[in-house]
């Protein structure tokens, strides 16, 4: 029975109709009125654009220097071969982000994905997928293919700009379509629960490349959506702490030697005799203290005061925590 008017019905997975190994229809009901389109559109966009998967991103074909060429004994030109490689459905074991697979074939006939040589960490989901055709018994083709894990769609031009090193001649880049979902559509039909007839039924029609089960695809898409909405569940004003620039403990001028003041020889020698080596040492002295220094008269005192004033300093200043550790260690 229906509870409070504020309670929402929770959908359940009603049926998975497996039309083929790569095509399925998934039905969820009941949904509150309007939620069929709300959830259907959100899941559709995530399934098309945000599902992680593996794709061919680079290939090296023996005897081929660039993509605008042909290869003797091969029916297709190189651009056609690259387009066919984009349709390769590859599943790579978790924990590996990139792998290399090889293809070596000779003799007349089609070259298919099942001819690819790989280790146990790689599975080809469409082994009958045609890559090219060899036209005579003496024809042969050899290629090294790089497969990478990623998300969404990344054109080859984007990777060209990101490459730090110059790309070797003969390494051909392929537009990468990582998503294992080829086609996705949804329909909203009427549903009924007891006396309520204004509910929605969501039917998702999905085709994949065979590397991901439809039920798992929806589960992953729903998880991505839920994670993105988590921020709205506990809506708070989360302030990012401002990065404060670390200010030096002392004005850098105080750490400079007294010699930088370019005093007369008489004044400089008097200060050194009193172990006043840094400007920070000097500004903490008072006029009375300096006048007690042997051989330092009023003329030298006036000189020191004028030089300090030109730098915005004066005698009798108080400096907390002086001297700093860097000077104390010296």
UniProtKB/Swiss-Prot annotation:
Gene3D superfamilies (alphabetical): 5' to 3' exonuclease, C-terminal subdomain (1.10.150.20), DNA-directed RNA polymerase, insert domain (2.170.120.12), RNA polymerase, RBP11-like subunit (3.30.1360.10)
GO cellular component: cytoplasm; DNA-directed RNA polymerase complex
Region (Alpha C-terminal domain (alpha-CTD)): 250-330
Swiss-Prot/TrEMBL keywords: DNA-directed RNA polymerase, Nucleotidyltransferase, Transcription, Transferase
Enzyme Commission identifier(s): 2.7.7.6
Stored SUPFAM superfamilies: C-terminal domain of RNA polymerase alpha subunit (SSF47789), Insert subdomain of RNA polymerase alpha subunit (SSF56553), RBP11-like subunits of RNA polymerase (SSF55257)
Signal peptide: none
Presence of the UniProt keyword Transferase in the record: yes
Domain of life, source organism: Bacteria
Catalytic activity: RNA(n) + a ribonucleoside 5'-triphosphate = RNA(n+1) + diphosphate
GO BP field: DNA-templated transcription
HAMAP family assigned to the protein according to its UniProt record, in alphabetical order: RNApol_bact_RpoA
Family: Belongs to the RNA polymerase alpha chain family.
Subunit structure: Homodimer. The RNAP catalytic core consists of 2 alpha, 1 beta, 1 beta' and 1 omega subunit. When a sigma factor is associated with the core the holoenzyme is formed, which can initiate transcription.
Free-text note regarding domains: The N-terminal domain is essential for RNAP assembly and basal transcription, whereas the C-terminal domain is involved in interaction with transcriptional regulators and with upstream promoter elements.
Job description of the protein: DNA-dependent RNA polymerase catalyzes the transcription of DNA into RNA using the four ribonucleoside triphosphates as substrates.
Name this polypeptide is given: DNA-directed RNA polymerase subunit alpha
Organism of derivation: Vibrio campbellii (strain ATCC BAA-1116)
Gene: rpoA
